[in-house]
């Protein structure tokens, strides 16, 4: 409908101009000028609206579109009327700037701009020059149509704020029951201005476009083009220093401290064995050429078993080997201490230092030659300053006297009562002493056999024999009486059996006694006691005896040749072994868990 009305008006204007005397260019210019002048004089009250409209036209002339290429507005009318319309538009373009309602437009931030979008049903493309001429030509027709159709309204609201406020352009138009709205909002300061332009477009219908915040950039691009991507850059220059975003420093993960893996139990064990170490002064029968001629006595480091292994009791010098210190060296050290005083670099834990004169030292050495008691030698080493001493030990030695204490220990008869049990020296005894000991062991074995059966004296003698059988030196004497002890094992009480089994257990640890222990008589007696009614202690002892025999037999099997055993002995051994195997199977169901474990381990070893 809108297009048909526009075409009808164009035809009327073209028909009037086609009459004689009116189709000249001068008549067309005059007609357009008269129409423009009449329109301005007829409505003086609408000066503000015309001024806003002129600003819109100026904006259309100066502001380029989104695309930088020039665009034209093409009106689809008859080809023979194009020249007349073009001349009318050119005349209107030249006269509009002279009108009182036009305000020249400059690109300033303080001057508010207005936007009027008038679209007909025909194809529209925005151009800076042609659009202004079209609006100037259609101005008169719009004024005449205001009185005929009051229901068509058009409102343009332009709101702008200088500073940080918002700028809003609202274009409202109505055509019958349809309405659309264009809102452009921008912020530029704290002030606001508002321009409202109302116009009525006769038979033309405006298209109103509503925009939201999302389409803000797209709508603004119709009127402003630039390289600035933000709306705020239209009113103030781009900030030189952009906002800095706070970023927390990266967290540095601290490595956890390694846990304390110190073994305090080992420290306690080490402290325990340190208290039991000692050094023995022993004579050297064959003097070595490297030692001084007067150095007949040396301090020999005793090797003991510690939690960390076998270690010497004294310090090892850099060159290696045992730690030897002659008495001459000790005398020189004593003279140096007497001359220069005590060494300041000594351990502070020593509250008092020993002062030993050379005469006292010689007397002490003479006393040490009379005894081999390790306790007396330990005290002597503390007095000489070789081994550390505790404060209370130092006080006792000083109160009693050094030489007096050693002399009392040497002359004490209790010190000579059990010299063998206290002596730990590895050197062999003298031949006379060995003979005396062997005679003593032989006498003990005879006393055991001569005593009444199951008497208390017999039990005590067996206990003494157990202590003498600990060392391998006298096993050759005890093994001679094994066949007599087997008879006591079969006839004696529980206590007698227990002590005899202890003696056999000590003998089974020696490899030289293996052949005698695996004889037919011993094996049969041990197997006979291997039943559930026997006491737990006796069964455990028998199991240990067989474990030792099995270990020694497998370790040195090549030594047991056919010449060592007769045929009857080998048959009896295998026969007893078969019976022993059956009894082991029966003891796997023993009520005591310790016995069951021992039996199972022995079966696995065999």
UniProtKB/Swiss-Prot annotation:
Compositionally biased region (Polar residues): 15-26
Pfam families for this protein: Arm_2
ARM repeat residue intervals: 349-388, 470-509, 511-551, 568-606
Disordered, as annotated region: 1-85
Tissues where the protein occurs: Highly expressed in the developing neural tissues, neural crest derivatives and hind limbs.
Xref: InterPro entries: ARM-like, ARM-rpt_dom, ARM-type_fold
Domain of life: Eukaryota
Record Gene3D superfamilies: Leucine-rich Repeat Variant
Keyword line: Repeat
Coiled coil (residue ranges): none
Compositional bias annotation for Basic and acidic residues: 40-59
Similarity field: Belongs to the eutherian X-chromosome-specific Armcx family.
Protein name: Armadillo repeat-containing X-linked protein 5
Protein species of origin: Mus musculus (Mouse)
